[in-house]
Amino acid sequence: MEPAAPSCNMIMIADQASVNAHGRHLDENRVYPSDKVPAHVANKILESGTETVRCDLTLEDMLGDYEYDDPTEEEKILMDRIADHVGNDNSDMAIKHAAVRSVLLSCKIAHLMIKQNYQSAINSATNILCQLANDIFERIERQRKMIYGCFRSEFDNVQLGRLMYDMYPHFMPTNLGPSEKRVWMSYVGEAIVAATNIDHALDERAAWAKTDCSLPGEFKPELCVLVGAIRRLHDPPCYTKPFLDAKSQLAVWQQMKAIESESVSTHVVVVEALKLRENLAKAVQETIAYERHQYHRVCQMMCNNMKDHLETTCMLARGRTLATLADLRSTRYNLALFLLSEMHIFDSFTMPRIRGAMKQARCMSYVERTISLAKFRELADRVHNRSAPSPQGVIEEQQQAGEEEQQQQQEIEYDPEMPPLEREEEQEDEQVEEEPPADEEEGGAVGGVTQEEPAGEATEEAEEDESQPGPSDNQVVPESSETPTPAEDEETQSADEGESQELEGSQQLILSRPAAPLTDSETDSDSEDDDEVTRIPVGFSLMTSPVLQPTTRSATAAASSGTAPRPALKRQYAMVHTRSKSSENQQQPKKKSKK
């Protein structure tokens, strides 16, 4: 318990024993750092309390060679009663001596009380700092235990294997036998081994988070800085003036020999002594007021700010650590879910996908706050993407698409009046070339009863035209190395005559048009190939085109054999080329002249 502020009378009755007892009382109320406070912080606080107390002037400097030994009981009684002799104009040597001794004793006691208040203020600041350090590190210890308990219950004790053990029944394929289940579980163990690096990285991050949440490294230097700041803030008011005034007055009395001189009245000495004692008491009161109120309030305010900072830091660290814990738990759960989801689709690509994803996620587990399930699957897709079609599947799809396209083309019914495309015409010519030629004797005479005979004869004429290509009006006839025989010339003439008679008898209007000139590439291909491919002229028109007669293989075969034709799967068109007799006669002499 701190002593009350002294008055003038308290200074008069104080003695050395009471002052020493008060000092021992201050030492008994000291607060010391606990074991939780780090050693260097505790030493810093205790050293600040043992520093030399500020002393502007020592008692010897203030009182000089004056004797300031303890007074006797009789002298104490006289000192306490000197105020009763203020109006005494006589010269009482005993009273004057008691007044001078009271000034000396007041200076001694005031100096001791000021030093004691200095020490009390420093001890109080040291106690505040020790209590602050104890509170801070006790709060940090509670926070550490709380965070460690959270990690232990929600992360350390819930390892990857434990998670997968709790979750694997939901992901095991249902169609596995006992032996297959054992094989599947062995592969699950391999997947856990592949993910060990990621799990260790999560454990390391958890250890870092635990270290950050303990916060001793942050508050150790801050406490040391606070101790030095509080010690430097101790700046009590100056107390030297009343002591110097007392010293000068004592020197005057000594020079005047006021105690022995009869000329110096008791009234003058007593009044001056009471005035000096009052000034000393005021100095002591000011010092006590500063130490107990101003300096103590400043120390308490700084320590409270430190406590508020501690609470704020602890809350932020707790939130940050719990957020890290949630991220680590989420990453570990996503890792277990990824492994089991991959094992659920158990094929030859499962283990390569898992190993590749674990290698790529190794660095991410240290850098990223959390790794989602989608990220794990994305890393696995970089190794092998199950959703992407395989090369064999692409080939099969292309083949299937080709078959469907061919089937659609077969199902299309062409309009008889629609001219064939160039590609279809080439395919039809090739099919016509592959068909065996119909025998004229079996097919019957020209212009017979049946309707298939004109189509058969037209096909034979088309084949003869292909076997014996003839140039158009604008085309140069190349010289042939083979010379036709007379028998062939006669057959050609008879066939042309029969064709002209048949066309005249059927009353069909055929508008002949000269064929378009062929390009150089077509001329070259005609010269190189043995078989001529019929092409659509450049100036083609339905009104001036050759007659299109639909024919099929079944119809041709039926016409040659005399049987009924089978239904055709696809319409085929043959170009019926008509030549005038004059052009044939013009070409025939050329061949004969060549011969």
Swiss-Prot record:
Keywords: Early protein, Host nucleus, Phosphoprotein
Annotated segments matching region Disordered: 384-595
Disulfide bonds: none
UniProt biased composition (Acidic residues): 402-416, 423-443, 454-467, 487-502, 521-532
Cell location: Host nucleus
Residue spans of biased composition, Polar residues class: 469-484
GO cellular component: host cell nucleus
Low complexity bias spans: 392-401, 503-512, 550-567
Function: The IE1 protein has some additive effect on the trans-activating properties of the IE3 protein.
The protein, known as: Immediate-early protein 1
Organism encoding this protein: Murid herpesvirus 1 (strain Smith)
Gene designation per UniProt: IE1
